[in-house]
Curated annotation (Swiss-Prot):
Keyword Disulfide bond (UniProt): yes
SUBUNIT field: Hexamer; each subunit is composed of an acidic and a basic chain derived from a single precursor and linked by a disulfide bond.
Coiled-coil region(s): none
Protein name, entry field: Cruciferin BnC1
Organism: Brassica napus (Rape)
Signal sequence region: 1-23
CDD domains: cupin_11S_legumin_C (cd02243), cupin_11S_legumin_N (cd02242)
Family to which the UniProt record says this protein belongs: Belongs to the 11S seed storage protein (globulins) family.
Biased segments, Low complexity type: 149-161
Length: 490
């Protein structure tokens, strides 16, 4: 009994110590008296583009537990495969291209049809990706017989003109939101004529990130000559790809290649960075262009696995918006009900597009931090903290970032012809509460509570409670515009 008591006392002391250590890591990190519209603090230049990194040590980003990155890929630019130790949610702010990801342990479901042609057969549809996740039947047991299959593929490459097989490749375009698990390698290629701009939020505070709160890209190819300049206290030196750390002899044995080729994999003399320019055609197996949004179908719970999970959805189609008013704009949300993979990432997104003088009614995030990135236009934004202080009151414009901590109230009003933004939220099913409007917190209070709480008459309380009949979007031209009865359409 005494031994059990001692063990419990030790466990309790250890728990208190660990809790205290965690709390002291960033004391009062969310006691924010002022927010700022943030610009990138570091720019990593490459041959065919650049990577812009925001300072994740900024108090408002540190409070939210996230970092933010913008990738600008020029035409024919290839962002070489890399992965992070954190969950990542990305948004295509501009342009179009291709995106590929490699999920550990999953089979190559995109393949040249000539792979399966008999020796004397005439290949049909060569170079076209079958790309059907339903081909899993043809790949059963692939993991067990993979090395043997590689040998067969080597023979086929000599006798049948075998080209390639790889994991899923998708077309991406403006408005696409892309969810990526930790450890999943990802690459992008710009096959359009304008720059491909992708912004990403990395959830550094995620339970899946077992490292510290620093964004750490792991490069499978390419390099970063400037080094990880955003990590404080680290000696700055060029960041190489992870193959560079192994000896060429080890790589030669692992890949069954000669030492000279193994040295090429290490990119030691390559200063192109991690976004390179492709010379000539970029021939990968790709599917046909997809429709605006996948058709909703009934599922039995077995169709989607980690290998076949859908990881993209487009938020730029007003016909799929959650809130839509032709004269004001629209708001679309993306959560784990729309994209089940977000349940594991514990992230979600909101896309907004409003016209000049339209206003998003005052609201706060009930269960998530939010990071707002402006993709087009300008808006006047006010943010109020838990102390009732206005911690931000100013303009945000294209390319700027504003972090809005959980519970902080915010109102947005478009000051340009059109204001468009994307918000990333640190909850798979983020919830908002509004201060004004048909579904607001004040609408749910009794008149007597409002009257006594604000020391106003019952008639004034009635106007406060019922005058705004919209739920999310309204005009900001002043009370005079609400003189007559209107139809509740938002």
């Amino acid at each position: 009994m005494a031994r059990l008591s001692s063990l419990l006392s030790f466990s309790l002391a250890l728990l208190i110590f660990l809790h205290g250590s965690t709390a002291q890591q960033f004391p009062n990190e969310c006691q924010l008296d002022q927010l700022n519209a943030l610009e990138p603090s570091h720019v990593l230049k490459a041959e065919a583009g650049r990577i812009e990194v925001w300072d994740h040590h900024a108090p408002q980003l540190r409070c939210s537990g996230v970092s933010f990155v913008r990738y600008i890929i020029e035409s024919k630019g290839l962002y070489l495969p890399s992965f992070f130790s954190t969950a990542k949610l990305s948004f295509v702010a501009k342009g179009e291209g291709l995106m590929g990801r490699v999920v550990p342990g999953c089979a190559e479901t995109f393949q040249d049809s000539s792979v399966f042609q008999p020796s004397g057969g005439s290949p049909s549809g060569e170079g076209q990706g079958q790309g059907q996740q339903g081909q899993g039947q043809g790949h059963q047991g692939q993991g067990q017989g993979q090395q043997g299959q590689q040998g067969q593929q080597g023979q086929q490459s000599q006798g049948q003109g075998f080209r390639d097989m790889h994991q899923k490749v998708e077309h991406i375009r403006t408005g696409d939101t892309i969810a990526t698990h930790p450890g999943v390698a990802q690459w992008f290629y710009n096959d359009g004529n304008q720059p491909l701009v992708i912004v990403s939020v990395l959830d550094l505070a995620s339970h899946q990130n077992q490292l510290d709160r620093n964004p750490r890209p792991f490069y499978l190819a390419g390099n970063n000559p400037q080094g990880q300049v955003w990590i404080e206290g680290r000696e700055q030196q060029p960041q190489k790809n992870i193959l560079n750390g192994f000896t060429p002899e080890v790589l030669a044995k692992a890949f069954k290649i000669d030492v000279r080729t193994a040295q090429q994999l290490q990119n030691q003399q390559d200063n192109r960075g991690n976004i390179i320019r492709v010379q000539g055609p970029f021939s990968v197996i790709r599917p046909p262009l997809r429709s605006q949004r996948p058709q909703e179908t009934e599922v039995n719970g077995l169709e989607e696995t980690i290998c076949s999970a859908r990881c993209t959805d487009n938020l730029d189609d007003p016909s799929n918006a959650d809130v839509y008013k032709p004269q004001l704009g629209y708001i679309s949300t993306l959560n784990s009900y729309d994209l089940p993979i977000l349940r594991f990432l514990r992230l979600s997104a909101l896309r907004g597009s409003i016209r000049q003088n339209a206003m998003v009614l005052p609201q706060w995030n009930a269960n998530a931090n939010a990071v707002l990135y402006v993709t087009d236009g300008e808006a006047h934004v006010q943010v109020v903290n838990d102390n009732g202080d206005r911690v931000f009151d100013g303009q945000v414009s294209q390319g700027q970032l504003l972090s809005i901590p959980q519970g902080f109230s915010v109102v947005k009003r478009a000051t340009s012809e059109q204001f468009r933004w994307i918000e990333f939220k640190t909850n798979a099913n983020a919830q908002i509460n509004t201060l004004a409007g048909r579904t607001s917190v004040l609408r749910g209070l009794p008149l007597e509570v409002i009257s006594n709480g604000y020391q106003i008459s019952l008639e004034e309380a009635r106007r406060v409670k019922f005058n705004t009949i919209e739920t999310t979007l309204t005009h900001s031209s002043g009370p005079a515009s609400y003189g007559g009865p209107r139809k509740a359409d938002a």
